[in-house]
Protein backbone atom coordinates (compact mmCIF):
# COMPACT_ATOMS: atom_id res chain seq x y z
CA UNK A 1 0.00 0.00 0.00
CA UNK A 2 1.48 3.31 -1.05
CA UNK A 3 1.11 6.15 1.36
CA UNK A 4 0.40 9.85 1.51
CA UNK A 5 1.73 12.08 4.26
CA UNK A 6 1.26 15.72 5.06
CA UNK A 7 3.86 17.61 7.07
CA UNK A 8 1.92 20.62 8.29
CA UNK A 9 3.98 23.52 9.50
CA UNK A 10 1.04 25.91 8.94
CA UNK A 11 -2.68 26.17 8.50
CA UNK A 12 -3.74 29.11 6.29
CA UNK A 13 -3.82 28.81 2.52
CA UNK A 14 -2.88 31.86 0.45
CA UNK A 15 -3.87 31.98 -3.22
CA UNK A 16 -1.08 32.65 -5.69
CA UNK A 17 0.80 31.36 -8.79
CA UNK A 18 4.04 31.56 -10.88
CA UNK A 19 7.16 33.72 -11.43
CA UNK A 20 10.76 34.09 -12.33
CA UNK A 21 11.85 33.71 -8.69
CA UNK A 22 14.19 30.81 -8.15
CA UNK A 23 15.54 29.18 -5.01
CA UNK A 24 18.92 30.53 -4.01
CA UNK A 25 21.66 27.91 -3.85
CA UNK A 26 25.17 29.08 -3.01
CA UNK A 27 27.41 29.12 -6.09
CA UNK A 28 30.29 27.80 -4.05
CA UNK A 29 33.62 26.65 -5.42
CA UNK A 30 33.82 23.06 -6.57
CA UNK A 31 34.61 20.74 -3.63
CA UNK A 32 37.70 18.56 -3.86
CA UNK A 33 35.50 15.46 -3.84
CA UNK A 34 33.45 16.53 -6.89
CA UNK A 35 34.00 16.63 -10.65
CA UNK A 36 32.06 19.51 -12.25
CA UNK A 37 31.59 19.66 -16.03
CA UNK A 38 29.73 22.42 -17.86
CA UNK A 39 28.13 22.96 -21.26
CA UNK A 40 27.55 19.34 -22.25
CA UNK A 41 25.13 19.15 -25.18
CA UNK A 42 22.35 16.64 -24.58
CA UNK A 43 19.89 17.43 -27.38
CA UNK A 44 19.61 19.63 -30.47
CA UNK A 45 15.95 20.27 -31.33
CA UNK A 46 15.49 22.99 -33.94
CA UNK A 47 19.26 23.67 -33.81
CA UNK A 48 18.99 24.92 -30.21
CA UNK A 49 21.98 22.91 -28.90
CA UNK A 50 20.55 22.30 -25.43
CA UNK A 51 23.18 21.82 -22.74
CA UNK A 52 23.52 20.59 -19.19
CA UNK A 53 26.02 20.99 -16.36
CA UNK A 54 27.00 17.92 -14.36
CA UNK A 55 28.43 17.41 -10.87
CA UNK A 56 29.52 13.93 -9.82
CA UNK A 57 31.54 12.31 -7.04
CA UNK A 58 35.20 11.58 -7.73
CA UNK A 59 35.04 8.42 -5.66
CA UNK A 60 32.37 6.31 -4.02
CA UNK A 61 30.21 3.25 -4.42
CA UNK A 62 29.53 3.10 -8.15
CA UNK A 63 27.21 3.21 -9.96
CA UNK A 64 25.70 6.37 -8.53
CA UNK A 65 22.06 7.45 -8.47
CA UNK A 66 21.30 10.54 -10.55
CA UNK A 67 19.12 13.63 -10.11
CA UNK A 68 17.87 15.86 -12.94
CA UNK A 69 17.52 19.48 -11.70
CA UNK A 70 15.14 21.77 -13.61
CA UNK A 71 15.25 25.55 -13.21
CA UNK A 72 12.23 27.84 -12.95
CA UNK A 73 11.43 31.14 -14.59
CA UNK A 74 7.80 31.14 -15.65
CA UNK A 75 8.60 28.97 -18.69
CA UNK A 76 10.02 32.07 -20.40
CA UNK A 77 13.20 32.84 -18.45
CA UNK A 78 15.71 31.33 -16.05
CA UNK A 79 18.99 29.49 -16.41
CA UNK A 80 20.42 26.10 -15.57
CA UNK A 81 23.30 27.92 -13.86
CA UNK A 82 20.98 28.75 -10.95
CA UNK A 83 21.09 25.09 -9.89
CA UNK A 84 24.88 24.64 -10.06
CA UNK A 85 25.08 24.99 -6.29
CA UNK A 86 22.39 22.36 -5.73
CA UNK A 87 24.18 19.97 -8.08
CA UNK A 88 27.43 20.41 -6.15
CA UNK A 89 25.60 19.73 -2.88
CA UNK A 90 24.03 16.57 -4.27
CA UNK A 91 27.34 15.35 -5.71
CA UNK A 92 28.92 15.66 -2.25
CA UNK A 93 26.15 13.35 -1.01
CA UNK A 94 26.88 10.67 -3.60
CA UNK A 95 24.66 11.63 -6.55
CA UNK A 96 25.41 12.50 -10.14
CA UNK A 97 23.42 15.72 -10.50
CA UNK A 98 22.71 17.56 -13.73
CA UNK A 99 21.07 20.94 -14.28
CA UNK A 100 19.51 21.31 -17.71
CA UNK A 101 18.49 24.04 -20.12
CA UNK A 102 15.22 23.72 -22.04
CA UNK A 103 13.42 25.70 -24.74
CA UNK A 104 11.51 28.72 -23.48
CA UNK A 105 8.27 30.52 -24.33
CA UNK A 106 7.02 32.41 -26.20
CA UNK A 107 9.08 31.08 -29.10
CA UNK A 108 8.63 27.52 -27.88
CA UNK A 109 5.29 26.62 -26.33
CA UNK A 110 4.11 23.48 -24.54
CA UNK A 111 5.08 20.68 -24.93
CA UNK A 112 8.57 21.71 -26.13
CA UNK A 113 9.96 22.07 -22.60
CA UNK A 114 8.49 18.68 -21.64
CA UNK A 115 10.12 17.10 -24.70
CA UNK A 116 13.44 18.62 -23.63
CA UNK A 117 13.49 17.43 -20.02
CA UNK A 118 12.45 13.97 -21.16
CA UNK A 119 15.31 14.04 -23.66
CA UNK A 120 17.63 14.96 -20.78
CA UNK A 121 16.55 11.88 -18.81
CA UNK A 122 17.07 9.68 -21.86
CA UNK A 123 20.52 11.22 -22.41
CA UNK A 124 21.51 10.42 -18.83
CA UNK A 125 20.45 6.81 -19.32
CA UNK A 126 22.22 6.56 -22.68
CA UNK A 127 25.44 7.82 -21.08
CA UNK A 128 25.09 6.04 -17.75
CA UNK A 129 28.14 3.83 -18.20
CA UNK A 130 30.38 6.80 -19.10
CA UNK A 131 29.46 8.68 -15.93
CA UNK A 132 29.08 5.71 -13.54
CA UNK A 133 25.31 6.23 -13.22
CA UNK A 134 22.77 3.57 -12.27
CA UNK A 135 20.09 3.99 -14.97
CA UNK A 136 17.48 2.45 -12.70
CA UNK A 137 17.93 5.14 -10.02
CA UNK A 138 17.15 8.52 -11.58
CA UNK A 139 15.10 11.16 -9.79
CA UNK A 140 14.25 14.77 -10.52
CA UNK A 141 13.64 18.07 -8.76
CA UNK A 142 12.68 21.58 -9.79
CA UNK A 143 11.19 24.83 -8.60
CA UNK A 144 8.16 26.76 -9.90
CA UNK A 145 8.04 26.14 -13.67
CA UNK A 146 10.83 23.62 -13.08
CA UNK A 147 8.71 21.97 -10.41
CA UNK A 148 5.91 21.65 -12.95
CA UNK A 149 8.27 20.03 -15.47
CA UNK A 150 9.72 17.69 -12.84
CA UNK A 151 6.19 16.72 -11.83
CA UNK A 152 5.25 16.17 -15.47
CA UNK A 153 8.12 13.70 -15.73
CA UNK A 154 6.75 11.91 -12.70
CA UNK A 155 3.15 11.59 -13.89
CA UNK A 156 3.73 10.78 -17.59
CA UNK A 157 6.01 7.79 -17.25
CA UNK A 158 5.50 5.72 -20.38
CA UNK A 159 3.24 8.28 -22.11
CA UNK A 160 4.70 8.23 -25.63
CA UNK A 161 3.02 11.41 -26.90
CA UNK A 162 5.32 13.58 -24.75
CA UNK A 163 8.65 11.99 -25.67
CA UNK A 164 9.43 14.32 -28.57
CA UNK A 165 12.34 13.69 -30.94
CA UNK A 166 15.24 14.93 -28.83
CA UNK A 167 17.39 11.84 -29.24
CA UNK A 168 17.97 8.39 -27.73
CA UNK A 169 14.38 7.15 -28.31
CA UNK A 170 15.41 3.63 -27.35
CA UNK A 171 15.83 4.74 -23.72
CA UNK A 172 13.14 5.45 -21.13
CA UNK A 173 12.44 8.95 -19.80
CA UNK A 174 10.89 7.61 -16.60
CA UNK A 175 12.04 8.89 -13.22
CA UNK A 176 11.90 7.01 -9.95
CA UNK A 177 10.89 9.94 -7.72
CA UNK A 178 10.18 13.68 -7.75
CA UNK A 179 10.82 16.58 -5.38
CA UNK A 180 8.53 19.42 -6.50
CA UNK A 181 9.12 22.89 -5.08
CA UNK A 182 6.01 25.08 -5.49
CA UNK A 183 5.24 23.92 -9.01
CA UNK A 184 1.72 24.40 -10.40
CA UNK A 185 -0.47 21.33 -10.85
CA UNK A 186 -3.68 22.67 -12.45
CA UNK A 187 -3.49 25.54 -14.94
CA UNK A 188 -7.29 25.70 -15.26
CA UNK A 189 -7.52 27.17 -11.75
CA UNK A 190 -4.69 29.66 -11.89
CA UNK A 191 -5.89 32.93 -13.37
CA UNK A 192 -7.64 34.29 -10.29
CA UNK A 193 -5.06 32.92 -7.88
CA UNK A 194 -1.81 34.41 -9.13
CA UNK A 195 -0.13 37.74 -9.67
CA UNK A 196 1.15 36.83 -13.14
CA UNK A 197 -0.64 33.78 -14.55
CA UNK A 198 -2.57 35.95 -17.01
CA UNK A 199 0.76 37.12 -18.45
CA UNK A 200 2.70 33.85 -18.29
CA UNK A 201 0.27 31.11 -19.30
CA UNK A 202 -0.87 32.51 -22.67
CA UNK A 203 2.79 32.66 -23.72
CA UNK A 204 3.39 29.05 -22.68
CA UNK A 205 0.08 27.63 -23.91
CA UNK A 206 -0.74 29.76 -26.94
CA UNK A 207 -3.74 31.53 -25.45
CA UNK A 208 -5.71 32.09 -22.26
CA UNK A 209 -8.06 29.58 -20.64
CA UNK A 210 -11.02 30.56 -22.80
CA UNK A 211 -8.97 30.31 -25.99
CA UNK A 212 -6.94 27.18 -25.17
CA UNK A 213 -8.80 25.26 -22.48
CA UNK A 214 -7.72 21.87 -23.85
CA UNK A 215 -4.04 22.86 -23.69
CA UNK A 216 -4.47 24.12 -20.12
CA UNK A 217 -5.83 20.70 -19.15
CA UNK A 218 -3.30 18.71 -21.19
CA UNK A 219 -0.35 20.60 -19.65
CA UNK A 220 -1.56 20.22 -16.04
CA UNK A 221 0.15 17.39 -14.10
CA UNK A 222 -2.99 16.91 -11.99
CA UNK A 223 -4.85 15.36 -14.91
CA UNK A 224 -2.11 12.85 -15.68
CA UNK A 225 -1.94 11.23 -12.24
CA UNK A 226 -2.34 7.45 -12.39
CA UNK A 227 -1.23 4.61 -10.10
CA UNK A 228 1.99 4.56 -12.16
CA UNK A 229 3.02 8.08 -11.05
CA UNK A 230 6.36 8.46 -9.29
CA UNK A 231 6.51 9.02 -5.50
CA UNK A 232 6.66 12.74 -4.86
CA UNK A 233 7.66 15.19 -2.13
CA UNK A 234 5.88 18.54 -2.49
CA UNK A 235 7.34 21.58 -0.68
CA UNK A 236 5.18 24.70 -0.73
CA UNK A 237 4.74 27.89 1.29
CA UNK A 238 1.49 29.46 2.43
CA UNK A 239 2.47 32.98 1.35
CA UNK A 240 3.31 32.05 -2.23
CA UNK A 241 1.96 34.87 -4.42
CA UNK A 242 2.66 33.05 -7.68
CA UNK A 243 1.66 29.41 -7.19
CA UNK A 244 -1.10 28.84 -4.66
CA UNK A 245 -0.41 26.42 -1.83
CA UNK A 246 -3.69 24.72 -2.74
CA UNK A 247 -2.11 23.64 -6.04
CA UNK A 248 0.10 21.28 -4.00
CA UNK A 249 -2.86 20.16 -1.90
CA UNK A 250 -4.91 19.21 -4.96
CA UNK A 251 -2.28 17.00 -6.56
CA UNK A 252 -1.29 15.44 -3.24
CA UNK A 253 -4.90 14.36 -2.74
CA UNK A 254 -5.15 13.14 -6.34
CA UNK A 255 -2.04 11.01 -5.89
CA UNK A 256 -3.38 9.68 -2.60
CA UNK A 257 -6.58 8.64 -4.37
CA UNK A 258 -4.45 6.81 -6.95
CA UNK A 259 -2.54 5.02 -4.16
CA UNK A 260 0.73 6.78 -5.00
CA UNK A 261 3.14 7.89 -2.28
CA UNK A 262 2.89 11.67 -1.81
CA UNK A 263 4.20 13.91 0.97
CA UNK A 264 3.24 17.58 1.28
CA UNK A 265 5.64 19.67 3.34
CA UNK A 266 3.94 23.01 4.02
CA UNK A 267 6.08 25.97 5.03
CA UNK A 268 4.28 28.41 7.33
CA UNK A 269 4.59 31.89 5.84
CA UNK A 270 6.86 30.64 3.07
CA UNK A 271 6.96 32.75 -0.08
CA UNK A 272 7.79 31.74 -3.65
CA UNK A 273 11.38 30.58 -3.37
CA UNK A 274 11.42 30.65 0.46
CA UNK A 275 13.60 33.75 0.31
CA UNK A 276 12.20 35.15 3.56
CA UNK A 277 12.35 31.84 5.43
CA UNK A 278 14.82 31.45 8.29
CA UNK A 279 18.11 29.57 7.89
CA UNK A 280 16.67 26.87 10.13
CA UNK A 281 13.68 26.38 7.84
CA UNK A 282 15.90 26.32 4.75
CA UNK A 283 18.08 23.66 6.38
CA UNK A 284 14.97 21.64 7.20
CA UNK A 285 13.88 21.87 3.55
CA UNK A 286 17.33 20.76 2.33
CA UNK A 287 17.27 17.81 4.71
CA UNK A 288 13.77 16.79 3.59
CA UNK A 289 14.90 16.72 -0.04
CA UNK A 290 18.01 14.70 0.77
CA UNK A 291 16.08 12.25 2.95
CA UNK A 292 13.51 11.72 0.20
CA UNK A 293 16.18 11.02 -2.40
CA UNK A 294 17.98 8.78 0.09
CA UNK A 295 14.79 6.77 0.57
CA UNK A 296 14.02 6.33 -3.12
CA UNK A 297 17.39 6.43 -4.91
CA UNK A 298 19.96 4.96 -2.55
CA UNK A 299 20.26 1.18 -2.30
Predicted regions and their residues:
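Positively charged n-region of N-terminal signal peptides that target proteins for export
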Residues: 1-9
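Alpha/beta-hydrolase superfamily serine-hydrolase fold, recognizing
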Residues: 25-299
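Bacterial N-terminal signal peptides
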Residues: 8-23
Amino acid sequence: MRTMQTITLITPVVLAFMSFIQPAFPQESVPESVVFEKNIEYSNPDDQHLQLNMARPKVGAEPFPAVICIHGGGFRAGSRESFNGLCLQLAEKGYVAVTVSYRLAPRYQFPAAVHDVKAAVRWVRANAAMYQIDPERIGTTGGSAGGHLAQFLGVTRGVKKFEGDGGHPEYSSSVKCVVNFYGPSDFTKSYDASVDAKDVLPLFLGGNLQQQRHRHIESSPLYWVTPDAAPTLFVHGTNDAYVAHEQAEWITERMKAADVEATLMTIDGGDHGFRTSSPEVKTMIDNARLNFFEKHLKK
